[in-house]
Amino acid sequence: MLAGVLLLYPLDVYVMRPGNAYNVSEYVTVQDGDEDDEGSFSLMTVTLSKASPLMYVYAKFKDYYELISMNQVRQDEEDDNEYNIRQAKLMTDSQFNALYVAFSRTDLEYKVTFNGVYVLNIITGGAADGILEPGDEIVEIEGEHIDSQAMFAQRIVEMRDQGQYDIELVINRDDELFTEVVTLKEIPNSKGKVGLGVVFSESKSITTDPHVNIDIGSIGGPSAGLMFTLEILNQLVDEDITKGY
């Protein structure tokens, strides 16, 4: 029993340690792209996990291991699911930015689509609690397509100031659209501020010609944006920008 506690009981502390290096070309494929380059770009990772009592002690004395407090990793009221969703969104954004920069530099065709706002976190006891879920995309507000994060926030403020607290939203959840009415209310611990009670970010997608596929598996976080960009560029142009390294 004691051994199980020492090995498995999660503490409110994280251990960060070195991960692995990956050849980015194994995860990025440009349609009809240049493939005869001699060098490669590498994606470096770190591993972040909750510490058990035994791992906590081990990390204290192990080179290149670092103990990190919970509030350095998690946002306020963020649970495990919300944390994982935020990390996945950061990786999606990293890939979007890499495609945008690479195609902008090469003057090849691309199109950016604003999909709506992406729900990262639901504040417990807030207006959206029990209605919205982390990972939802809000695509319309009161019949209007959401074309920017600023537009969405401004519409919420305008409706609140006009005394309209019942707000109709169209939600995309797992590629299924549905409508919900959320009633604005005071956000807990906000000193009287009224709103939806969600943390959100922009949801954008990009289509390119030629098509690019990025499949990084379970790696999350804001990693590898520069390496993705360089690898995409390297496959788009004839030049070997790795210079053989």
Residue spans for each PLM region:
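Hydrophobic membrane-insertion alpha-helices, especially the h-region
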Residues: M1-P10
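PDZ/PDZ-like peptide-tail recognition elements
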Residues: V15-E35, F41-A51, M70-I123, V181, ...
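Terminal peptide-recognition signature
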Residues: F103, A128, G135-I138, L169, ...
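Hydrophobic beta-strand core residues of beta-sandwich domains
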Residues: I122, L132, I146, M159-D161
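Conserved PDZ fold ligand-binding element
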Residues: A128-M151
